[in-house]
Amino acid sequence: MEKKELRIVYMGTPDFAVESLKALVEGGYNVVGVITMPDKPVGRHGSVLQASPVKEYAVSQNLPVLQPEKLKDEAFLAELRALEADLQIVVAFRMLPEVVWNMPRFGTFNLHASLLPQYRGAAPINWAVINGDTETGVTTFFLTHEIDTGKIIRQKHLPIADTDDVGIVHDALMTMGAGLVTETVDLLLEGKMDAVPQEEFFKDPAELRPAPKIFKETCRINWNQPLKKIYDFVRGLSPYPAAWTELVAPDGSRMALKVY
């Protein structure tokens, strides 16, 4: 199959997802539609609507854009079917219902910013740095019912220096991931796409580290930990969302301080 014969629908929202979409467009792949989050209210009183980075890029390339509030909405599903996708690609979007990920004849694959099955979840880059890992990477895998558990198609590895913060690792994985997305599509075009169950990558589920969503309280520094753990914790949250601690003034007032 030739590049232009494969109809691709792309799904993503933040900056991390722009690089992969850009690689597909500039590589001459046939992106027939882009799905992203609805514009969100910003500014005073939410009077201004801000488009996602993916939407901004898609519009600049004259790509059709859909922004569903609900992924099971029949009107959206009808529009999605009308795009007649052969393949869907997901990068930093949201959990998809089966009616969506099972729609194309070649299925839907996701780019995840870890070496799956390690760090399944919403914040894999942060947790790899917080835990002091010396290596991470990116994985493409097929979507299935359980989040981040589908068969692995391909992986790339990235070393983490002990001076790297999460921003540095994020940007490196963003670039590496874009290359992996196009490589994965090429495997499909060449008829060489073999996917391996994640169970073949570990013996004991206890070996797996999760990557849950990070909340404000998660970012509070525990000064009772060893210095190395505190150092890794801070760089794993820098520059965003930022580790923090509390300063108590002589008068008893408290102030939160971000630590980078």
Model-derived features: where do they sit?
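N-terminal beta-loop-helix "entrance" segment that forms/cooperates
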Residues: 40-59
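Internal anion-binding site segments
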Residues: 203-260
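Donor/substrate-binding cores of folate-linked one-carbon enzymes
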Residues: 27, 87-210
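Structural motif corresponding to alpha-helix initiation and N-cap regions
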Residues: 18, 51, 73-77, 94, ...
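Surface-exposed, charge/polar-rich loops and edge strands
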Residues: 4-5, 168, 218
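Internal alpha/beta domain cores that form substrate/cofactor-binding pockets in large enzymes
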Residues: 9, 32-35, 64-83, 88, ...
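N-terminal Rossmann-like dinucleotide-binding module
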Residues: 1-45
